[in-house]
Curated annotation (Swiss-Prot):
It is found in: Cytoplasm; Nucleus. This is DNA damage checkpoint protein LCD1. GO terms for cellular component: cytoplasm; nucleus. Keywords: Chromatin regulator, Coiled coil, Cytoplasm, DNA damage, DNA repair, Nucleus, Phosphoprotein. The lineage of its organism: Eukaryota, Fungi, Dikarya, Ascomycota, Saccharomycotina. Pfam families: LCD1. It comes from Candida glabrata (strain ATCC 2001 / BCRC 20586 / JCM 3761 / NBRC 0622 / NRRL Y-65 / CBS 138). Its main location: cytoplasm. GO terms for biological process: chromatin organization; DNA damage checkpoint signaling; DNA repair.
Length: 667
């Protein structure tokens, strides 16, 4: 069925492409005809003008000779005048070449198809860095750096970048960019900027007395540098940047080592200042953005297998292992911002391994098995939209209130902390110490939202958490595709953890999500279907790696989850159109409005809208309504669930339960 759908979709795409090509060719032919017609008209007008100029000059010459000639020459002049109209006249042969030599055309040239003027990429890169602004911050990044100076470093001097103690870091960077702008190509400039900024960050961090005030904004400029033109970054620079970022993350690992629960003996008697903690949080999150960006740029460049293996060598994988063990922690409080970036890094790396069919993996199967163990633990966390900011229960996914700022790559959260970044500096004043920011300012914001019962931000965060779990499923799927029957990767743990995931999500459907007019339901449905497809693939192709003990551990949950998927198809047949119309008004009102807009669009395009279009629109909106009522999955996933139950589970289920199961399946 999937192949038929794909073929039908490809045929529709090919038909649309042929229509668009025919339309483009037709417009181009009409345009060429108009141009040719205009050219012919211009040529005829120019010929007519030349003829009139020649004729007027000939007449003027004859009149001049008549005025200066003696009377006895009148007869000769008149004969010459008559000869002007004769093609064989010797007068024309004598004077016309001279007139053509002195003629100057005043007709302006018209460029019918001007060439596109390509903007100077180096200047565009300079402008991009100069106007870069972090989302939610009032000042640009360069403007913030213009207010920051060294506090204990007397002078920084590395190649082309020179910064004195009394001058701002931003002015030094701008001078450096302007000096490089004149005599460097884009790829040279990008590598040079990354090298100088990384060296500057190292100099600040190595000095124990120097504050890290400027480091997060320097890291933000590095992210913008490699994202401006990914193809301009060399592979060697990317590898150095990857290792540098891993070292930077390990330098600030203390931020990731917060205890799961607050000690009852701990008493907060000190001042509730937040500026130094905020700077460390920014450095950590932006460093993970830099790590994620570097990995994605490597994927975009589509290197050969040899270059991939040289990039992801043993030393780099060791650095990456140390970073993911800090991020996907079990003993400390998780930070969802950096976990998201870490998972995105592994999605990209496993895509390279699986889709490029590499002969050797990046790391052994044992290396990846240890990673999966930590991902399974993250996959088991519950997602509740009314607990997204509650960090007291670590079994639920949540975002720390003091990490609630947008990263450089995704806008996750409410971004309540980002406006405080502009308060760290004072305009028109250069300082090496940040201004005071209090924790109470952030706490008061969330208490106010809690009292007002704001839920929209929570729903957005809920979707982000579901997307995170879906990315983890993509990692599992990629590793299954690459390692195939390796029991360290493809084993019963996949069945156990994904079955629990489906069971928990289906419970969430019944407890909180059914009959809610929100698109979170569709996102969660896609997550369940993705998990089911992996279980189906595991069951069909790698069944020898599934032990009986693994099946027994989740037998009841698996049977119940699959039964809920299968029985939905039979339940949906009992709902008539009138009932669906009533349900649609109650629980699918936004889709109902979207349907009405689509109908209005078709009515504007057609005098009488075809019946098949009406039926398709009604069918799509009814399917969406049934999904929100949890009474319908896609047919392909229903068949997957049926296959699993029919093929193998009957060996582990009693006869009575088997009869009930077949009855519910429609047999």
């Amino acid at each position: 069925m999937l192949r038929d759908k794909l073929k039908l979709l490809q045929a529709q795409i090919e038909q649309e492409r042929s229509k668009s090509n025919y339309r483009v060719n037709e417009v181009k032919e009409e345009f060429d005809k108009e141009i040719q017609k205009l050219r012919q008209q211009l040529q005829s007008l120019e010929d007519e003008k030349k003829f009139l100029v020649l004729e007027s000059r000939g007449i003027n010459a004859v009149n001049q000779r008549i005025k200066t000639s003696p009377p006895e020459a009148f007869s000769r002049v008149s004969s010459q005048h008559r000869a002007l109209n004769t093609p064989d006249s010797s007068h024309i042969q004598e004077h016309i070449p001279k007139k053509r030599k002195t003629e100057i055309s005043t007709q302006p040239s018209i460029v019918l198809n001007p060439n596109r003027v390509i903007k100077d990429e180096v200047s565009a890169f300079f402008d991009c860095l100069y106007v870069h602004r972090i989302v939610g911050v009032e000042l640009s990044t360069i403007e913030i750096l213009n207010c920051i100076k060294f506090e204990h470093i007397d002078e920084f001097n590395y190649k082309l970048l020179k910064i004195n103690k009394d001058t701002s870091i931003g002015s030094g960077i701008v001078d450096f960019l302007q000096s490089c702008k004149k005599n460097m190509k884009l790829n040279e400039l990008v590598d040079s900027v990354l090298e100088h900024l990384a060296t500057l960050i190292k100099a600040i961090i190595i000095n124990d007395q120097e504050l890290n005030f400027s480091v997060p904004f320097l890291v933000a400029l590095m992210v913008q540098t490699i994202l401006f033109r990914p193809s301009a970054v060399s592979v060697n620079s990317l590898k150095d940047l990857f290792i540098f970022t891993c070292d930077l993350i390990r330098k600030f690992q203390i931020v990731l080592k917060k205890p799961l629960h607050k000690s009852p003996l701990e008493v907060d008697l000190g001042p509730q200042i937040f500026q130094y903690e905020l700077i460390d949080n920014l450095i950590l999150v932006y460093s993970f953005d830099l790590l994620e960006s570097t990995t994605k740029v490597i994927r975009i460049q589509q290197l050969s297998e040899t270059l991939y293996m040289e990039f992801f060598d043993e030393s780099l994988m060791k650095s990456l292992e140390a970073v993911y063990k800090l991020t996907l922690t079990i003993s400390f409080k998780p930070v969802i911002n950096v976990i998201y970036s870490m998972v995105a890094v592994f999605v990209t790396i496993t895509n390279i391994m699986n889709n490029d069919n590499l002969s050797k993996p990046f790391g052994s199967s044992k290396w990846w098995s240890d990673l999966l163990t930590r991902l399974y633990q993250l996959l088991g966390k519950r997602i509740l939209n009314f607990h997204v900011f509650d960090d007291t229960n670590t079994n639920n996914m949540h975002i720390d209130r003091f990490f609630d700022f947008y990263s450089l790559l995704r806008n996750m959260g409410t971004n309540s902390v980002s406006p405080l970044l502009a308060q760290l500096v004072t305009r028109g004043e250069i300082k090496g110490i940040p201004n005071i920011v209090l924790k109470d300012d952030i706490i008061d914001k969330y208490e106010s939202k809690k009292e007002k019962g704001v839920l929209s931000d929570n729903l957005e965060l809920e979707k982000w958490f579901v997307y995170l779990k879906d990315d983890i499923l993509s990692i599992i799927e990629n590793l299954m595709g690459y390692f195939k029957k390796d029991s360290k990767i493809t084993n019963g743990e996949i069945l156990i953890n994904l079955t629990k995931l489906i069971s928990v999500e289906q419970s969430q459907f019944m407890d909180h999500l059914i009959d809610q007019d929100t698109d979170v339901f569709a996102v969660r449905m896609n997550l369940v279907e993705h998990a089911l497809s992996i279980i189906y693939r595991m069951w069909k192709y790698y069944e020898e790696n599934i032990t009986q003990e693994s099946i027994k551990e989740v037998e009841s949950e698996l049977v119940m989850s699959l039964w809920r998927i299968i029985v939905c198809k039979h339940a949906s047949k009992k709902i008539c159109k009138d009932d669906l119309m009533e349900h649609r008004i109650l629980i699918n009102q936004m889709e109902n409005l979207h349907l009405q807009d689509t109908i209005d669009l078709y009515e504007d395009a057609f005098e009488d809208m075809p019946e098949y279009i009406k039926e398709e629109l009604e069918c799509s909106i009814n399917n969406g309504t049934q999904q929100k009522m949890q009474v319908q999955y896609d047919d392909i996933y229903i068949e997957m669930a049926r296959y699993i139950l029919e093929s193998k589970l009957t060996n582990f289920i009693s006869v009575e339960n088997t009869d009930s199961l077949y009855l519910s399946m429609g047999f």
